[in-house]
């Protein structure tokens, strides 16, 4: 007890006297450490911007924490106050846009839960709502949009999901080539370059995971293989260049090899 912080002691007292008449909710921003939840990770229900303590055990699944009540979360999403993200002429700072991932995650998890229980109409409804209120053409964050890729496919709008995935992959390659073209004095931006293979893997995984949910593992495998083709092509072109340059000049191509190889990690 002596080593406990006051907030831990307060939480212990709340839990000791908890009678389930009023809910205990944990902020989405505070779940990064299990200690903050008193290691109750498996007894949570995802309610959008918070997690509610419930007497139902739900082990973490593919990185998603907590159970989802499809109808409850659908109502939460429908009652969101979205702000003014849909106005393309309005600029928001990073603090405001950081909430976008929570909005889209709510839509994704609600949409998947609805679709899996057979209510694909409601799933598509909130997907369209999210696109209307937070247009992907302006807010093209890969982390949050990749979750919507999965939801589109599971909800029966496969073409829209694949189109979004392909656009994200093209944008990632475009950004990758841009950062790679910068001179050495911009080394501080190398972190952005290293993010791109990870982002690419998120998109590919989003599609393959959707097919897995639908029992179409072969389609998921084929998509992964096809997504590796542009990477293999880039790698093959570099190898051919090296063979033509000879031993001495080939050392100048080593950075290109490392950049291409970094993408192979998504397998």
Q: What kind of feature is each model-predicted range?
A:
Residues 1-266:
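ER/secretory pathway lumenal C-terminal domains and tails of membrane proteins involved
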């Amino acid at each position: 007890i002596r080593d406990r912080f006051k907030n831990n002691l307060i939480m212990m007292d709340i839990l000791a006297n908890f009678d389930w008449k009023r809910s205990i909710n944990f902020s989405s921003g505070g779940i990064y450490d299990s200690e903050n939840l008193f290691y109750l990770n498996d007894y949570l229900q995802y309610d959008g911007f918070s997690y509610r303590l419930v007497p139902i055990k739900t082990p973490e699944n593919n990185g998603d924490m907590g159970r989802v009540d499809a109808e409850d979360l659908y109502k939460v999403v429908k009652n969101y106050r979205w702000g003014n993200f849909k106005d393309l002429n309005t600029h928001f700072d990073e603090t405001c846009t950081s909430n976008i991932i929570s909005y889209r995650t709510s839509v994704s998890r609600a949409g998947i839960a609805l679709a899996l229980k057979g209510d694909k109409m409601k799933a598509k409804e909130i997907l369209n709502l999210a696109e209307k209120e937070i247009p992907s053409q302006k807010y093209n964050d890969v982390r949050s949009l990749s979750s919507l890729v999965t939801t589109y496919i599971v909800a029966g709008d496969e073409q829209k999901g694949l189109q979004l995935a392909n656009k994200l992959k093209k944008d990632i390659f475009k950004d990758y080539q841009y950062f790679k073209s910068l001179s050495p004095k911009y080394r501080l931006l190398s972190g952005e370059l290293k993010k791109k293979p990870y982002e690419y893997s998120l998109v590919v995984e989003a599609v393959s995971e959707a097919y897995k949910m639908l029992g179409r593992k072969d389609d998921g495998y084929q998509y992964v293989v096809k997504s590796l083709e542009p990477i293999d092509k880039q790698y093959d072109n570099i190898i051919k260049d090296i063979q033509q340059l000879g031993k001495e000049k080939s050392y100048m191509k080593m950075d290109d090899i490392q950049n291409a190889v970094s993408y192979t990690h998504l397998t």
